[in-house]
């Protein structure tokens, strides 16, 4: 017996791992391998995630599409057997359902799915001829809309947060010279903002895939001499003076700023740099709130779909029980 995915996705996955794919209803479906390949080609990630509002037992988050055999079992679990009578009513109903599944996988902007949501959408896409199409369409359209908006907001927030992180690195460097009452060179003796270690990265490839790197690679560069050879860096001046970022360019920059108790240009520079990033900080807070709201709406659509599934299954079970009791 395979426990229901709606109640505990961890138990559902454990049960699937303990059966052979040949034991599942859709193992012989003519479209099983096609759907497996479609999920892979669309880079769809299906994961189980602990939700304290739904799950009584804590379990580790897991991306289950990393395991192709497990993905095959998940698809075989909800796929029905092929119709024996080709061209009949059941066969037509089944083919229409499979067509909807394929269309959904190919057109949905969302590629990150929690198992409950994925199974719910697949189940209803496959069986839509037997339930209320209008209700299903409203719920799934809502999920797609909020899922797409959530993805775009996440990308925008990642870019904003990365730019803010670069400003924080610059501010830390300025503060270091302020505390020592020294001079900061922001040009040819500047720290290299392309240094991955400044942002907590240890792997160069991971850094090059980061939002910080994507911003920095659009900046002008300064050529410096290191051990007799030329090296290009992104200096503090390069970054602050560039238009190629959300906050725009900071004008009238000098190459260096010194501490002076009577006319403290270093302190003024620190304030100017901080003021430049303040609207960005406000925007990050605003976008974070928007993302939280969109995520809440997306989760509400998933919950509505799951409640609809449970109600539908409950009604069908009662009908089956009544029929078998006669």
From Swiss-Prot:
Coiled-coil regions, chain positions: none
A single Gene Ontology CC term: extracellular region
Keyword Secreted: yes
Covalent S-S links between cysteines: none
Main localization, broad class: secreted
Lineage top rank: taxon: Bacteria
Subcellular localization: Secreted
Key words, A-Z: Plasmid, Secreted, Virulence
Record function comment: Possibly involved in calcium regulation of YOP expression, which includes the export process.
Name of the protein in its database record: Virulence-associated V antigen
Organism: Yersinia pestis bv. Antiqua (strain Angola)
Record gene name: lcrV
């Amino acid at each position: 017996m395979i426990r229901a995915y709606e109640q505990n996705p961890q138990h559902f996955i454990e049960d699937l791992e303990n059966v052979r794919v040949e034991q599942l209803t859709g193992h012989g479906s003519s479209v099983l391998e096609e759907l497996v390949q479609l999920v892979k080609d669309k880079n769809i990630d299906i994961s189980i995630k602990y939700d304290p509002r739904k799950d009584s037992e804590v379990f580790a988050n897991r991306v289950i599409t990393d395991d192709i055999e497990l993905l095959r079992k998940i698809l075989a679990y909800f796929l029905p057997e092929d119709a024996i009578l080709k061209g009949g009513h059941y066969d037509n109903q089944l083919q229409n359902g499979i067509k909807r599944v394929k269309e959904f996988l190919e057109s949905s902007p969302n590629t990150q799915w929690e198992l409950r949501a994925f199974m719910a959408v697949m189940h209803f896409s496959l069986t839509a001829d037997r339930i209320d199409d209008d209700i299903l369409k409203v719920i799934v359209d809502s999920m797609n809309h909020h899922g797409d908006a959530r993805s775009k907001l996440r990308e925008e927030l990642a870019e904003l947060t990365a730019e803010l992180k670069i400003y924080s690195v610059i501010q830390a460097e300025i503060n270091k010279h302020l505390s020592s009452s020294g001079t900061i060179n922001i040009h040819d003796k500047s720290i290299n903002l392309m240094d991955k270690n400044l942002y907590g990265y240890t792997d160069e490839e991971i850094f090059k895939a980061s939002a910080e790197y994507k911003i920095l690679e659009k900046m002008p560069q300064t050529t410096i001499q290191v051990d007799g050879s030329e090296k290009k860096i992104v200096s503090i001046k390069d970054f602050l003076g560039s238009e190629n970022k959300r906050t725009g360019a900071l004008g009238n920059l000098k190459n260096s700023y010194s501490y002076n108790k009577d006319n403290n240009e270093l302190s003024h520079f620190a304030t100017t740099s901080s003021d430049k990033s303040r609207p960005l900080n406000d925007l990050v807070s605003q976008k974070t709130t928007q993302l939280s709201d969109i995520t809440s709406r997306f989760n509400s659509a998933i919950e509505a779909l799951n409640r609809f599934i449970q109600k539908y299954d409950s009604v069908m079970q009662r009908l089956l029980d009544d029929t078998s009791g006669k």
